[in-house]
Regions:
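Short coil turns that delineate tetratricopeptide repeat
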Residues: 46, 80, 114-116, 150, ...
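Alpha-helical segment of the N-proximal tetratricopeptide repeat
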Residues: 47-74, 78, 255
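Start-of-helix register in tetratricopeptide repeats
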Residues: 50, 84, 118-120, 160, ...
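Residue-level recognition of tetratricopeptide repeat
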Residues: 57, 91, 127, 167, ...
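Register position in tetratricopeptide repeats
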Residues: 61-62, 95-96, 131, 164, ...
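Conserved structural position within tetratricopeptide repeats
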Residues: 74-77, 110-111, 147, 187, ...
Length: 329
């Protein structure tokens, strides 16, 4: 009986201690400030950061890169792993010619990008190298993008990526690799199931367009370029790709320029897209070759009003900056 009584008293004591501990813990929790769920706070910061990126992109399109970069920096302070902010910062820095700084942001964007945006980030890095005509470095990123698209059976997208790399090679002076990648793009496009005759003609036009530009740049093969130009025109004349007709003056002007027929080049390129920096750059160069330096400078200045981050501007903008800087000295 004594043992039972002692045991009962011990259990009662322990129960009272446990109850007291629970009451103290509850009082402690009640005294703590009620915090918002971390996910809600993070989402709010991300939304604010994305709005800053949007505002920065508008400023960048207006040529206000410094102001845009200030907003991207604020966005990254709010959301340090926001790939859109790093991507946009890299683009703005490329337009300023600050390529090493740009690639630090773009490398971070590639790491941060979700799977659906990885290809975009990779291709943006490739364009960064196109600004310096560094096709081999650009290829490291374009190939990753191409492989991802090809493996996902996104053949039209993969063909576009291959053609983009081919153009970077061509405008960097490597016509052999340009041929290989244009050919890869053409063959990849034909993997698409159930292509219509118009779609087949589209890819044939692009292939003939590529061959015309490649041959006119190759030593000893420039005489072949007009044949491919005529083949491209014949495809357009079938009329099943009317939206491609607007590209023909650029193609014709390009071939004429590299055949040293600057009068024809100017006449054709003036019919082309006057908002395309590469067309404007070719016009400027053709005017220079013709001795019209004032008109050339006018075209170079127009190039610098365009703030897109794509291969055409990557080829045109650095040259325009160089030419304008030379006359400003």
């Amino acid at each position: 009986m004594c043992n039972n009584g002692a045991s009962m008293r011990l259990r009662t004591f322990l129960l009272h201690c446990s109850l007291a501990a629970l009451l103290l813990w509850a009082a402690f929790l009640c005294a703590q400030p009620q915090a918002s769920p971390p996910s809600a706070k993070t989402a709010a910061k991300t939304d604010d950061a994305l709005e800053l990126v949007k505002q920065g992109q508008k400023l960048n399109s207006e040529g206000k890169q410094d102001e845009a970069l200030a907003l991207y920096d604020r966005a990254l302070q709010l959301s340090p792993n926001l790939f859109q902010a790093d991507l946009a910062a890299g683009m703005a820095l490329d337009l300023q010619g600050k390529y090493q700084q740009a690639r630090q942001h773009l490398a971070k964007a590639i790491e941060e990008a979700p799977p659906a945006s990885k290809v975009q980030a990779l291709r943006t890095m490739a364009v960064s190298y196109a600004f310096e005509h560094n096709a081999d470095e650009a290829a490291k990123y374009e190939r990753q993008a191409f492989d991802a698209q090809y493996n996902a059976k996104q053949y039209a997208d993969a063909a576009g990526t291959a053609d983009e790399l081919a153009r970077i090679y061509l405008e960097s002076g490597d016509s052999d690799n340009a041929f290989q990648w244009y050919q890869s793009g053409h063959l990849t496009a034909l993997h698409q199931p159930n292509l219509s005759s118009a779609e087949k003609d589209l890819w044939e036009f692009r292939w003939e367009s590529a061959l015309a530009r490649i041959r006119v740049r190759q030593l000893g093969r420039s005489a072949e370029a007009p044949k491919h130009l005529a083949a491209a025109k014949a495809i357009l004349d079938k009329g099943d790709n009317p939206d491609q007709v607007r590209f023909y003056p650029y193609l014709s002007g390009y071939v004429a320029f590299y055949l040293h027929d600057y009068k024809t080049a100017i006449a054709e390129l003036q019919k082309g897209d006057q908002k395309d920096p590469f067309v404007l750059s070719l016009l400027a160069q053709a005017c220079e070759k013709s001795g019209d330096h004032a008109q050339a400078l006018d075209y170079y200045r127009k190039v610098l009003t365009i703030n897109t981050h794509n291969p055409t501007n990557a080829f045109a903008r650095p040259l325009a900056k160089e030419k304008i800087a030379a006359v400003s000295k």
